A protein has these predicted regions:
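Bacterial Sec-dependent signal peptides at the C-terminal "C-region" and cleavage site
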Residues: 7, 13-30
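N-terminal capping segment at the start of a domain
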Residues: 25-59, 69, 114-115, 195, ...
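Soluble non-cytosolic domains of exported or imported proteins
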Residues: 29-36, 49-60, 124-132, 167-171, ...
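A non-catalytic alpha/beta surface segment that caps or lines the substrate-entry region
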Residues: 37-97
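Solvent-exposed loop/turn segments at secondary-structure junctions
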Residues: 48-50, 79-82, 100, 113-117, ...
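Active-site-adjacent substrate-binding region
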Residues: 54, 79-81, 191, 200-311
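Structural recognition of the beta-strand scaffold that forms the well-ordered cores
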Residues: 93, 107-110, 151-154, 190-196, ...
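Acidic/histidine-rich catalytic neighborhood of metal-dependent amide-processing enzymes
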Residues: 117-222, 226-230, 238-243
Length: 311
């Protein structure tokens, strides 16, 4: 992903709102220790650009967890035309609580699992934490009912080959979004939360300004209920990320992204000193940050699921 607008601070006045009947079962089932362990395992695979051994090991891990948690597993495979030549791309989808109702609403939790084509780049946070937290979501979803069909989507080739200009970057998400549109399924998707770089020890999730505000408000509500408001939406920025292709086909979406990874300033990358640097290693990732984001996002899904039942 790439930052495309300067940071703007926000002063937030938050209050705790408690909804009647909130069970908390899904968000309480989230295991941050497992999310961190998965992050460590994925980072241990080394570099993970498409086609690499680390990339293939990550795919195998994802499929193994989806099989164990009894997800309906689908693949979205295609060959992307890139500045580097043709590249095989593999989006992986795990579906939970699928019913026979062809109009059953869908909610997507997504994150990319590839890393840059850059020698020595491990991407423990950028690519590692997002893939790992989805694996922990799979375990939380296993055996728990929701009215919505929940999709976990691991997008591939999110990273640009040269730069996020024209059609370079977001290859997997662009393909999947267009596929949903062509199949007439986009209206069934009530929303998408994209998770990116959410393992940062100094967690500070941006209010990404192209994202769907009403869904951001649900996240803010969930964070307030859990006492996590200070970690969310304290500044605004605009990010070109995997949520953008879904917005373009009419799917509400939020980029849940920590856009300040390490020291900020004119002499470093616009998203922080560790962004796209070989210093994006496991020591920069925090189990506490994974817990804050994981519990908040799953409580947000619960709140949305409850509201669907009231319609």
């Amino acid at each position: 992903m790439i930052r495309s607008r300067a940071r703007a601070a926000i002063v937030v006045l938050s209050c705790v709102v408690v909804l009647d009947g909130a069970s908390g079962t899904l968000h309480e089932a989230f295991n941050a220790a497992k999310a961190y362990a998965y992050t460590a395992q994925i980072a241990g695979f080394g570099e993970r650009p498409p086609g690499s051994p680390g990339h293939q090991k990550t795919q195998s891990l994802i499929r193994e967890v989806l099989k164990t948690t009894r997800a309906t597993i689908e693949s979205d495979d295609f060959t992307a035309t890139t500045p580097r030549g043709p590249i095989a791309v593999h989006n992986i989808i795990g579906k939970y609580n699928v019913t026979a109702d062809r109009n059953q609403p869908i909610f997507i939790l997504a994150g990319h699992y590839d890393t840059l084509f850059k020698k020595g780049f491990i991407g423990a946070n950028d690519g590692g934490s997002s893939a790992a937290i989805l694996l922990a979501f799979a375990e939380a979803l296993a055996g728990r009912s929701t009215r919505m069909q929940i999709w976990l989507v691991w997008t591939d080739l999110e990273e640009a080959i040269e730069s996020f200009e024209g059609d370079d970057g977001l290859y997997g998400s662009r393909h999947l979004a267009q596929k949903l549109k062509a199949a007439g399924m986009a209206p069934r998707v009530k929303g998408l939360f994209l998770l990116d770089m959410i393992g940062d020890k100094n967690l500070n999730v941006a209010r990404e300004i192209s994202s769907t505000r009403s869904l951001q408000d649900v996240i803010a509500e969930a964070a307030a209920q859990l006492g996590y408001s200070r970690y969310f939406f304290q500044y605004e920025t605009q990010i070109i990320d995997d949520h953008v292709p879904f917005l373009s086909v009419g799917i509400p979406a939020v980029d849940v992204v920590d856009a300040e990874f390490g020291r900020m300033g004119p002499s470093v990358d616009g998203m922080g000193e560790f962004h796209h640097a070989n210093t994006d290693t496991l020591d920069k990732v925090s189990q506490q940050s994974l817990e804050i984001v994981g519990r908040t996002i799953l409580l947000s899904v619960e709140l949305l699921d409850q509201r669907l039942a009231r319609r």
